[in-house]
């Protein structure tokens, strides 16, 4: 007891000596954080759930507080989007006749299942009832045996024989029940077979089958086995995938367009084969891949294709599963392509995002040939930048066309000048030195080959000479036409002196004159509307008159 009392006294002294407030005040901020973390590990708050007691070991700062409702909404949205993707990738479409037959099959199957279940339940109930009866009889026999303990051994043997007979009867009943179930199933199958045969034997069904056979072309069925596959496609696109891929690889010059729009369940490997085959093709102008389930891998392959292809002008990849990364990759490779004029990538499954839109606007500056873009920008900034860049490209294309037209006109003029020089016998370049006028369109008519001469009257028979004499001979136009003669007539021009002319030095620009031209033109203000008095008129006349025209006037008597 003495030792225990001593220990308690020492603990009390230690508690009195230790001051926690002073110790905590002396600790630094880092030491306080360490102490707090250790205390949380040693003695966690019992009111918190287990998931929040655990220490957060992530270095990244949290983006926001935990929200259970937003997490549930996100999970529901992910589940719904996954279901929509599966429905879009594997659409289930049937023709009306197929839907009817499928409904009939389902109804017949339901009836068969219900009949089988009903028969099984009935037989099971009968078996259970028989077992209960047999158990009841055995219980009665046991009670009788207890009461009649003094009976002979013969009676015991008879009781054992009765038990064996009851077990055999139960087995026989179970076998009969199984046979009845099998017979019911066979009967159901026979009923369904009879119903299908009756439907086939009906005159309406026979007429429909005859119509279908008459609509089909036996030549097409014999030559092309893919005809049946194409006709059953619900999208309506009758493109033969294998045949078109073969033609693209062979670089068929007759194939100018490749349309794969709305074709269901195209494997990704085949899409990649199409895109890779387009790299070396030189004849296809339009390539359409709308609503075919293309993803980022197809987009990256398209970007590489645009980097190498030099013939495609329009590309359509609308209504697919391409994200912003794939679109940015395509736009990045457009700086190496100078033939694409139209690009459509609207209505994607995922939003591109603001960063992708700004990147598209930045990358489009390096391309000078794209004229149309099928996409609605969400941000106003990239939208304005892209519209300005497309108008710039259109202006450049217009200027290029105008230059080509001018060059074509110059070539035509040179051809006409060469024709003039050859026709007039001038040496080459003499027409320009003489300062001749520019060739006119009438010169082509002048230098056309002359019409054939009339036949010699000596070689013509006498019967045709009288007819030729009656008809007045028409002189050729190039001899009597005065306008063409005036154009061909050369003009007299003074010869240029060989001595170089004394050129005047260029006038220096006067800065004061330039400043005056930059000033706005002063407006002449109209005079104020004031009535002129006789005194003002007199003074005005005196100002505009001279002393020679003044008349001497005598002074009145009053003034004198």
Curated annotation (Swiss-Prot):
Stretches assigned to the WH2 domain: 534-553
GO BP: actin filament organization; actin nucleation; muscle contraction; myofibril assembly; pointed-end actin filament capping; positive regulation of skeletal muscle fiber development; skeletal muscle fiber development; skeletal muscle thin filament assembly
PTM per Swiss-Prot/TrEMBL: Ubiquitinated, leading to its degradation. Interaction with KLHL40 negatively regulates ubiquitination and degradation.
S-S bridge residues: none
The keyword Thylakoid appears for this protein: no
Acidic residues composition bias: residue spans: 142-167
Coiled coil found in the keyword field: yes
Gene Ontology molecular function: actin monomer binding; tropomyosin binding
Family membership noted in the UniProt record: Belongs to the tropomodulin family.
Disease affiliated with this protein: Nemaline myopathy 10: An autosomal recessive severe form of nemaline myopathy. Nemaline myopathies are muscular disorders characterized by muscle weakness of varying severity and onset, and abnormal thread-like or rod-shaped structures in muscle fibers on histologic examination. NEM10 is characterized by early-onset generalized muscle weakness and hypotonia with respiratory insufficiency and feeding difficulties. Additional features include arthrogryposis or congenital contractures, ophthalmoplegia, a history of prematurity, reduced fetal movements, and polyhydramnios.
Entry protein name: Leiomodin-3
Provenance organism: Homo sapiens
């Amino acid at each position: 007891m003495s030792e225990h009392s001593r220990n308690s006294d020492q603990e009390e002294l230690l508690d009195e000596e230790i001051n926690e407030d002073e110790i905590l005040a002396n600790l630094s901020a880092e030491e306080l954080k360490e102490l707090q973390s250790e205390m949380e590990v040693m003695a966690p708050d019992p009111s918190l759930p287990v998931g929040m007691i655990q220490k957060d070991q992530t270095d990244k700062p949290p983006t926001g507080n935990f929200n259970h409702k937003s997490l549930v909404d996100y999970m529901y949205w992910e589940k719904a989007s996954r279901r929509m993707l599966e429905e879009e990738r594997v659409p289930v479409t049937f023709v009306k006749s197929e839907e009817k037959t499928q409904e009939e099959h389902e109804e017949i199957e339901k009836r068969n299942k219900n009949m089988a279940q009903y028969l099984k339940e009935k037989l099971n109930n009968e078996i259970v009832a028989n077992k209960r009866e047999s158990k009841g009889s055995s219980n009665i026999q046991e009670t009788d045996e207890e009461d009649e303990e003094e009976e002979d051994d013969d009676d015991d043997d008879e009781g054992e024989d009765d038990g064996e007979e009851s077990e055999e009867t139960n087995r026989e009943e179970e076998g009969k029940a199984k046979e009845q179930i099998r017979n019911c199933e066979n009967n159901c199958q026979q009923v369904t077979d009879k119903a299908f045969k009756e439907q086939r034997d009906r005159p309406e069904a026979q007429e429909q089958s005859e119509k279908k056979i008459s609509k089909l072309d036996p030549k097409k069925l014999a030559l092309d086995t893919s005809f049946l596959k194409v006709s059953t496609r619900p999208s309506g696109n009758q493109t033969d995938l294998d045949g078109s891929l073969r033609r693209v690889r062979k670089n068929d010059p007759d194939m100018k367009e490749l349309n794969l729009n709305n074709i269901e369940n195209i494997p990704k490997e085949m899409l990649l084969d199409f895109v890779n085959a387009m790299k070396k093709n030189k004849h296809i102008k339009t390539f359409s891949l709308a609503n075919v389930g293309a993803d980022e891998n197809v987009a990256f392959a398209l970007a590489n294709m645009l980097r190498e292809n030099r013939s495609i002008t329009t590309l359509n990849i609308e209504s697919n599963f391409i994200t912003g990364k794939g679109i940015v990759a395509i736009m990045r490779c457009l700086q190496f392509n100078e033939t694409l004029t139209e690009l459509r990538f609207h209505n994607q499954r995922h939003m591109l995002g603001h960063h992708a839109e700004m990147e598209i606007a930045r990358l489009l500056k390096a391309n000078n040939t794209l004229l149309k873009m099928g996409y609605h920008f969400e941000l106003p900034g990239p939208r304005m930048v892209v519209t300005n860049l497309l108008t710039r490209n259109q202006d450049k294309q217009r200027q290029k066309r105008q230059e080509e037209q001018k060059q074509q006109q110059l070539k035509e003029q040179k051809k006409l000048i060469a024709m003039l020089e050859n026709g007039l016998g001038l040496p080459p370049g003499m027409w320009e030195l003489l300062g001749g006028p520019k060739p006119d369109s009438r010169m082509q008519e002048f230098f056309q080959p002359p019409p054939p001469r009339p036949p010699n009257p000596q070689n013509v028979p006498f019967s045709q000479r009288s007819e030729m004499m009656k008809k007045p001979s028409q002189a050729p136009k190039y001899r009597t036409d005065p306008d063409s003669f005036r154009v061909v007539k050369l003009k007299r021009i003074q010869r240029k002196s060989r001595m170089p002319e004394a050129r005047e030095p260029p006038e220096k620009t006067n800065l004061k004159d330039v400043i005056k031209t930059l000033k706005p033109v002063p407006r002449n203000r109209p005079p104020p509307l004031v009535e002129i008095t006789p005194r003002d008129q007199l003074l005005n006349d005196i100002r505009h008159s001279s002393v020679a025209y003044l008349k001497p006037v005598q002074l009145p008597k009053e003034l004198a």
